[in-house]
Amino acid sequence: MNKFIAALLIALLALVACTSDAASSEAELPEMDLDAFVARLESSAKPAVVNVWASWCLPCRDEAPLFTSAHAEYGDRIDFYGVAYNDNQPGARQFLAEFDLPFTHYFDFDGDALVRFGGIGVPRTYFFGPGGELANTVNGVLTEDTLTSNLEELLGS
């Protein structure tokens, strides 16, 4: 019985090691070039939502599925972006894989986006009108109603 448990433990450790290697070989999130990002927002005719999150943030994990759903419904009319803040690449990649967030994400370890757009802590969500004008900011976890009302406001509904 002890040999069976030892063999099972070795197999489990090997599986974990293989899984870790697979995750570390995935492409890293691109570092955020904040000036280029702001220029993209300012030159866009579409409104945008920027969600700042971290894989270690429990409220961020709570609201992540809302962004997947919102992107499915509004993604053709509103640009969605995610910014991983004060995180590490493996944690950020695992978070994205777990929640299947199907839009562009950037890595911002130092929190330059929070400084530039205003605010501290995560989660934090910025809503920009066409041309990059900041329309609203929500600090803390979003509810479905709050997210939907902000998205509808961006669209002028």
Model-derived regions: residue spans:
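Bacterial N-terminal signal peptides that target proteins for export
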Residues: 1-8
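C-terminal motif of bacterial Sec signal peptides marking the signal peptidase cleavage site
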Residues: 13-17
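A short beta-strand-turn-helix
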Residues: 27-47
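Short active-site neighborhood of thiol/selenol oxidoreductases, capturing the structured segment around
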Residues: 40-61, 67
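Hydrophobic beta-strand anchors of alpha/beta hydrolase catalytic cores
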Residues: 49-50, 80, 125
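Structural microenvironment flanking redox-active thiols in thiol-disulfide oxidoreductases
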Residues: 61-99, 109-115
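Thiol/disulfide oxidoreductase modules built on the thioredoxin-like
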Residues: 95-101, 109-155
